[in-house]
Amino acid sequence: YRPMRRAVLRADVDGGRWFVKLQRPKRHLEYLERMALLAPAGVTPPVVAAPAEGVTITAAAEGVSLAQALAAWSMQGAVEPDPASLLELLGRLPGGVRTLPPQRGHDVRLRMALETAAVELPGRASEIADLGERLLAADARAELGPVVATHGDFYEANIFTVDGRAVSVIDIESLGPGHLVDDLACLLAHLVVLPDLSPAHYGQVPGLIA
């Protein structure tokens, strides 16, 4: 996926499952540094090998993604995902993550999203601009808390669960210093749209969020 930027292939070999990530050389080195930083904490599947420039092989994550866990709970009455475990998982990110270069702030991403929305929906540009002003004003007043280690792309496809508990994350390229609310807001923003994407799979999710 992400043509010309990166791709991930699944390899099922001799009863085992591995994932092969292909990246540009510079991104590959940054990725390996982040994986080494996370390794002692056991919060992401380990690197098995880096056989060539731009190529990393990792083990498969234990359990199922939070997206799968939510669907199983909503449709089949499986164990309800534990929200507290999400905080515990984020709390296991090593403090050294705070020394990494910061990612783009959420205010920058918000402005980009507003600009894109205005282009795609020109008839509602005024409404979008008004919403943007209110969101940015609220953000300026918000108490964000201390700078902590953050995942940077914390949402249901990147979080893996076992028996409803969040135990690991994947896709750690956006790892860096930030605020806890950044990761939680990212997750919440993804969760609130799941019922619209697939009501049959995620119809119970609004109740969990509430």
PLM feature spans:
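Protein kinase-like catalytic domain
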Residues: 39, 94-98, 192-195
